[in-house]
């Protein structure tokens, strides 16, 4: 299997995100790389499904809460940038302050 550098990068993000998803399901708090991978992978998948850049930026801020990540991670992850493939080509998606809520309940309000 011959993969381009972009395809290898995408697989690396997926693998890190998969590890993060499994840890999150078990109640393990995510570290910085896991948090970035989790958000990046989600954004790439939504782009592939045809969601707009604006929708991805908005909905990505509801993926994780402070309860889901280790102490200090929300401050470290002040921005996530990823270049996913949309149906009409690659675009830069920038998600500012992706971890805004302290708890899941705050997201549901």
UniProtKB/Swiss-Prot annotation:
Location in or out of the cell: Cytoplasm
Keyword Hydrolase: yes
GO molecular function annotations of the record: nickel cation binding; urease activity
Catalytic reaction annotation: urea + 2 H2O + H(+) = hydrogencarbonate + 2 NH4(+)
Chief location bin: cytoplasm
Annotated Gene Ontology cellular component terms: cytoplasm
Pathway annotation from the record: Nitrogen metabolism; urea degradation; CO(2) and NH(3) from urea (urease route): step 1/1
UniProt-listed SUPFAM superfamilies: Urease, gamma-subunit
Record keywords: Cytoplasm, Hydrolase
Record InterPro entries: Urease_gamma, Urease_gamma/gamma-beta_su, Urease_gamma_sf, Urease_subunit
EC main group: hydrolase
Enzyme Commission number: 3.5.1.5
Entry-linked Pfam families: Urease_gamma (PF00547)
Statement: the UniProt record of this protein carries the keyword Cytoplasm: yes
Domain of life the protein comes from: Archaea
GO biological-process terms attached to the record: urea catabolic process
Coiled-coil zones: none
PANTHER family: UREASE
Subunit structure: Heterotrimer of UreA (gamma), UreB (beta) and UreC (alpha) subunits. Three heterotrimers associate to form the active enzyme.
NCBIfam families linked to this entry: PRK13241.1 (NF009712), urease_gam (TIGR00193)
Family from the record: Belongs to the urease gamma subunit family.
Name this polypeptide is given: Urease subunit gamma
Species for this entry: Natronomonas pharaonis (strain ATCC 35678 / DSM 2160 / CIP 103997 / JCM 8858 / NBRC 14720 / NCIMB 2260 / Gabara)
